[in-house]
Amino acid sequence: MATFKDACYHYKKLNKLNNLVLKLGANDEWRPAPVTKYKGWCLDCCQYTNLTYCRGCALYHVCQWCSQYNRCFLDEEPHLLRMRTFKDAVTKEDIEGLLTMYETLFPINEKLVNKFINSVKQRKCRNEYLLEWYNHLLMPITLQALTINLEDNVYHIFGYYDCMEHENQTPFQFINLLEKYDKLLLDDRNFNRMSHLPVILQQEYALRYFSKSRFLSKGKKRLSRNDFSDNLMEDRHSPTSLMQVVRNCISIHINDCEWNKACTLIFDARNYISIMNSSYTEHYSVSQRCKLFTKYKFGIVSRLVKPNYIFSSHESCALNVHNCKWCQINNHYKVWEDFRLRKIYNNIMDFIRALVKSNGNVGHCSSQESVYEYISDLFLICKTGKWNEAVEMLFNYLEPVDINGTEYVLLDYEVNWEVRGLVMQNMDGKVPRILNMNDTKKILSAMIFDWFDTRYMRETPMTTSTTNQLRTLNKRNELIDEYDLELSDVE
């Protein structure tokens, strides 16, 4: 029983403005839709159901029915979902605008209540006040919101969400923003609305209001790679594939500084209808390069590492070893389709082997060494603390020699030409015979930064940018970077 969805259905018939604003895919005819994946609340119609991906941001936040309108909370077009979306920091003035919008779209007064009651009482059996028949009148005005942190912005999507106790498989989390407003003022608004209802319905309204306005906020969730769909990618088999984003826009571009003012547009119905009549869509091809995706890829690589290779004498690179049960790696995983990860893995393993062999460690593929447990962490460049610890443990394992207060290890074992070039590039054009701790860190990090320079990466993919940000980046030709063209920083 989705209260918000029911309210939109019934209140849509009130006037021309409501008919335009409250149009939901969930209340229209069903059309073929993408397969659902996660359980959660559809941001468009607020019902708890199976969710599919959004074509505007790649997150799972829309139900199969609402997906036909392709609405995203990051759109520029001021549809109902966009007008319910607020950015931090939310002020009391912003909340006043939201509450006024609710009362404009979902009014409750004596005349309206009687109208709804008369339309329900078509037969004798409907003389009772059953909640199913009057669900649309039982939607209180609350400051309940689903919240998500994207890059440097926190977004609050206000609405009336039923079944808060159900399992939430999305990165959105429930937040109560009542502390941003006056509790007594909100109570007064709702008591005034409630006073026009029959006594039986008043009890249910009050119960719903207090349960949705007095709950404790939950902690923010961290985004993960699985929160984003692969369906927006041009080629799902290509590791550098671009992502196709569709955004709903209007001819009068609204500045992001005025983000929280979108809900006030409906106060001038004629102007709002004119704005909505100018709506159109913009399509962008954006890079998938970001820390979130990179961390996910290197996490898989770190679990596939065969550390025994650093003691081996194989002539082939790490990924091309065959017929050796200690060093042969399963290269049929999808992650190895990315040529950049193959290069990084081969180069790092070759360099570490050169350090091990140069410092008198005589071993074999089958050797069991204590340093093995740290080799996989050398690929977790996004986890700075863990990565630094792994490099330090490797360096200390090599038994460095103290020279004038600085510890050094040898590097006199043969390395491949690509590793040699990277070492020269980062060591002033030379291949030094000895390396200190900082030199070792510099070379190992350079092998990763050559393709995935996480120091300058966004935290989340560009699909989570606002429409104005996408438009600006597109003008500067920065939606696609060299990494997607298979060029490294050096090239």
From Swiss-Prot:
It comes from the Viruses. Pfam families: Rota_NS53. The keyword Metal-binding applies. One of its GO terms (cellular component) is host cytoskeleton. Residues 320-491 are annotated as: Interaction with host IRF3. Keywords: Host cytoplasm, Host cytoskeleton, Host-virus interaction, Inhibition of host innate immune response by virus, Inhibition of host IRF3 by virus, Inhibition of host IRF7 by virus, Inhibition of host RLR pathway by virus, Interferon antiviral system evasion, Metal-binding, RNA-binding, Viral immunoevasion. It is found in: Host cytoplasm, Host cytoskeleton. GO terms for molecular function: metal ion binding; RNA binding. A motif (pLxIS motif) lies at residues 485-488. One of its GO terms (biological process) is symbiont-mediated suppression of host cytoplasmic pattern recognition receptor signaling pathway via inhibition of IRF7 activity. Residues 42-79 are annotated as: Zinc-binding domain. Residues 1-81 are annotated as: RNA-binding. The keyword Phosphoprotein does not apply. Belongs to the rotavirus NSP1 family. Plays a role in the inhibition of host innate immunity by inducing the degradation of key host factors required to activate interferon production such as IRF3, IRF5 or IRF7. Associates with components of cullin RING ligases (CRLs) including CUL1 or CUL3, which are essential multisubunit ubiquitination complexes, to modulate their activities. Interacts (via C-terminus) with host IRF3; this interaction leads to IRF3 degradation. Interacts with host IRF7; this interaction leads to IRF7 degradation. Interacts with host CUL1 and CUL3. The integrity of the zinc-binding domain in NSP1 is important for degradation of host IRF3. The pLxIS motif targets host IRF3 for degradation; however phosphorylation of NSP1 pLxIS motif is not required for its activity. This is Non-structural protein 1. It comes from Rotavirus A (isolate RVA/Human/United Kingdom/A64/1987/G10P11[14]) (RV-A).
